[in-house]
């Protein structure tokens, strides 16, 4: 399952098209300064997510 604690680097690797997942659920904006440090949360890196996506909780794509 892909969820809020998933490593975004792994999530990004699994997604070949941003349309595969509905990015409408994390209260973060990838275009804003990373409030949790350079590694983001749960080991992920916000910059590994397409910069044009506005994240508002990661939805499970299943």
Curated annotation (Swiss-Prot):
Q: Which cofactor does it need?
A: Cu cation
One biological process GO term for this chain? Answer: lignin catabolic process
Post-translational modification here is noted as:
Glycosylated; contains 6% carbohydrates.
Q: How does it assemble?
A: Monomer.
Record's subcellular location: Secreted
The way its activity is modulated is described as:
Inhibited by sodium azide.
The identity of this protein, by name, is Laccase-C2
Q: Member of which family? A: Belongs to the multicopper oxidase family.
Q: Which UniProt keywords apply?
A: Copper, Lignin degradation, Metal-binding, Oxidoreductase, Secreted
CC per GO annotation: extracellular region
What does UniProt report on the pH dependence of this protein?
Answer: Optimum pH is 3.8 with 2,6-dimethoxyphenol as substrate, and less than 2.7 with ABTS as substrate.
Reported induction: By copper ions.
Enumerate the catalysed reactions.
4 hydroquinone + O2 = 4 benzosemiquinone + 2 H2O
Main localization is: secreted
Q: Tell me, what does this protein do in biology?
A: Lignin degradation and detoxification of lignin-derived products. Oxidation of a broad range of substrates including mono-, di- and polyphenols, aromatic amines and methoxy-substituted phenols accompanied by reduction of oxygen to water.
Gene Ontology MF annotations: hydroquinone:oxygen oxidoreductase activity; metal ion binding
Give any extra note attached to this record: On the 2D-gel the determined pI of this protein is: 3.85, its MW is: 67 kDa.
Temperature effect, per record, is: Optimum temperature is 50 degrees Celsius. Half-life at 60 degrees Celsius is 20 minutes. Half-life at 70 degrees Celsius is 3 minutes.
- Disulphide-bridged cysteine pairs: none
Its EC number is 1.10.3.2
Cofactor: binding details: Binds 4 Cu cations per monomer.
Residues bound to Cu cation are: 54
């Amino acid at each position: 399952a892909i969820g809020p604690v998933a490593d975004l680097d792994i999530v990004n690797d699994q997604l070949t098209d941003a349309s595969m997942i509905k990015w409408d659920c994390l209260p973060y904006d990838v275009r804003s300064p990373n409030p949790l440090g350079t590694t983001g949360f749960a080991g992920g890196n916000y910059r590994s997510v397409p910069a044009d996506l506005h994240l508002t909780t990661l939805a499970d794509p299943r």
